[in-house]
Amino acid sequence: MVPPGNGNGAAAAAGNDVILELSTPGDDWSHELQGDDVEANGGGNGDAPPRRTFSFGQAYKTRHRQPQVFTVWQTLMLGYQSLGIVYGDLGTSPLYVFPSVVLPDADATDFLGILSLIIWTLTLMSLVKYALIVLKADDHGEGGTFALYSLLRQHVNFKGNIPVPLTRLESDVHLKFHSKRRSRPSRLQLFLENSPKAQLAITIIVLIGTCMLIGDGALTPAISVLSAVQGIQSRSSHIKQKHVVVLSAVILVLLFLVQRFGTSRVSFTFSPIMLLWFASIAGIGVYNIVMHYPPVLKAVSPHYIYYYFAKNKRVGWEQLGAVILCITGAEAMFADMGHFNKSSIQVAFSTAVFPSLILAYSGQAAYLIKNPGDLSTAFYSSVPAPLFWPMFVVSTLAAIVASQSLISASYSIIRQSIALGCFPRTTVKHTSDKYEGQVYCPEINYVLMVVCVLITVGFQGGPEIGRAFGVAVIWVMLLTTTLMTVVMVVIWEVNGALAGGFFVFYLAIEGTYMTSLMTKVPQGGWVPFAITVAFLSVTLSWTYGRKKKREYEARHAVGDGEFAGIVSRSARVPGMCLFCTDLMDGVPPIVRHYAANTGSLRELLLFVTFRTLPVRTVLAGERFLVAREGARAGVYRCIAQYGYMDEQDMVGDDFVRAAVAALVEVAAAAAEADSGEEEAEMIGRAPASGVSYVIGRTVLRMRRARNWPKRFVINELYRFLQKNFRSNVSTLKLDHAKTLQVGMIYEI
């Protein structure tokens, strides 16, 4: 199987040099694929090779960005824009960190110790780990958990029986956006390639991490909006907590309901809002430091952490669950890197976000040293009275921006999960013609809305919601540390001792926080686990069902002899038929059912397999791998390759145009000259006689002899997901008038 246009492919092997040109597709099939097929070059004297011109269609203007060198001004502008997209969650954490601390009879030693913990947690976790280290592990500019995973799979051949399937092909390493493997693999790389259990463990870690991030999409809006709205209680004794909860729930419902309109119309306000927010909290922080306790910045010395734990012991350790909230949203620096670039995110964090947060927390600590009784309302109590209402408005707007960032991130995660085949197909709508990353998933939106409102109403704004949020945050941090350690050894070729030191150092920090938070599981910390288990159950049920389906089709593929009989018994009619299948080799069983029910086959048969690679995007010239299926004329195999950021569909005629162009090239170059030209002409005219799509509508049924857990997953969970999520016809945007679904029952 060769990619079209590959100089090392069948064209060279056949001794017939073929020069590919990309041209603008016309409306006439015959002109596009036949009339311009061969141009005489050099007056037909035979001195120059024939020149073939093919159109690959408009559908594959892939959404990748060419490598670009950014000027200082461009980097600064991107950094400014990142304030509203990347730093909403991290920036609004001063609303709830100190108020989440429960420390009776706190004094200056306690507040200096907590401030020192916050400063060093922000420095070591956000600045050093994420801004300086994790941001380097991008997949050609794309960040996030899936980017780390795809980067690993580009360097490690996952051959085990893992939930997310990928059969590596030799052509993969030649892709533009596929990282090159080093010639001498490390021992860790060899271990991973030969250990299916290790591969499964890494895959499960990635899936858990993504499910935790989806849970953040429900927890962040709840805690951010509640914390912002609660400030109104400090100015009116008539407003009770139940009123705050109702108002917060209304704001959250409205926030989720407007998602269908997209964020493009209001996203231009996000960065100004967050810039105003950071300037405000920094200014108020400086005011509180000067007015209440100027020496508060001495907390930068870590010995105050020792004094804090020496005094409070277990009670002090229990408050780590509140301190960890200061880095909520730090993972967004990596997850949203694809929208900006590494330098802009680093500049924004180091020049605006980090200093503002340090000043804000220091100001609150200075205020609390003089007013320890205001701990539960630390943020709003520390705001000077004349600025209260302006800050209330800015805080509420900033909380909405923070919520929007995590909600949008949840949609992106779901989209990538669907592309990798580890989540059921849901509706994914693009809400912006300009920004490809702005998508909307209606089903996920309403699930998150219900969960978010239930959390808000259930916890009533108590400390439990902070504990739940903290558990989700620290788990994501731990999973990222684990994956980064593997990346350091396998991809960066870092010395094992240095990579091990990184792992042990951050495991010690995050593990300490984890031990504190796990004691809070019965008191609200169970919520992120419940959300994760729910989404993970969907993910694993779907991938297990798809795996069993592929195994069944591979075992029951149509053999060469049987296929020859099917062709001989079937009438061949003009036109082209595309069979969509998960099989990358062999004739799928759907052909058997189709021929038995129709008694005919088109003159051009194309078995199409959609293949998602562990790369962010696949270039247009790398899209198709095509080859003849067996020795029969008019039967071909096409593998359509996509990255996890590409959109897979067959809308309009563009997919067929591109596929036919690739088939014409292979037919003309690989076969003998006479028959090759005849076959190429047949392929070129087939679409004009009609194009049809055949797709399976399969039902898996597991026999009673199998163990009941697997039977429950297949017969109940997987079947439920099949019935209630989108079908392949809707996902691929097939023309219903040209599509035939073949129903089949697979007994496994």
UniProtKB/Swiss-Prot annotation:
* Record's keyword terms, sorted: Ion transport, Membrane, Potassium, Potassium transport, Transmembrane, Transmembrane helix, Transport
Which parts of the chain does the record assign to the membrane side Extracellular?
92-113, 221-243, 287-319, 370-381, 460-470, 519-523
What biological-process terms (Gene Ontology) are attached?
potassium ion transport
Under the GO molecular function aspect, what terms does this record hold?
A: potassium ion transmembrane transporter activity
The keyword Amino-acid biosynthesis belongs to this UniProt entry's keyword annotation = no
Principal subcellular localization: membrane
A GO-annotated cellular component: membrane
Name the segments for region: Disordered.
30-51
Compartment list: Membrane
Which superkingdom?
Answer: Eukaryota
Membrane topology classification:
Multi-pass membrane protein
Give the residue spans that cross the bilayer.
69-91, 114-134, 200-220, 244-264, 266-286, 320-340, 349-369, 382-402, 439-459, 471-491, 498-518, 524-544
Cytoplasmic compartment residues: 1-68, 135-199, 265, 341-348, 403-438, 492-497, 545-748
Q: What's the stated role of this polypeptide? A: High-affinity potassium transporter.
Q: Which family does it belong to?
A: Belongs to the HAK/KUP transporter (TC 2.A.72.3) family.
Name the UniProt record assigns to this protein: Potassium transporter 6
Question: Taxonomically, what lineage is the organism?
Answer: Eukaryota, Viridiplantae, Streptophyta, Embryophyta, Tracheophyta
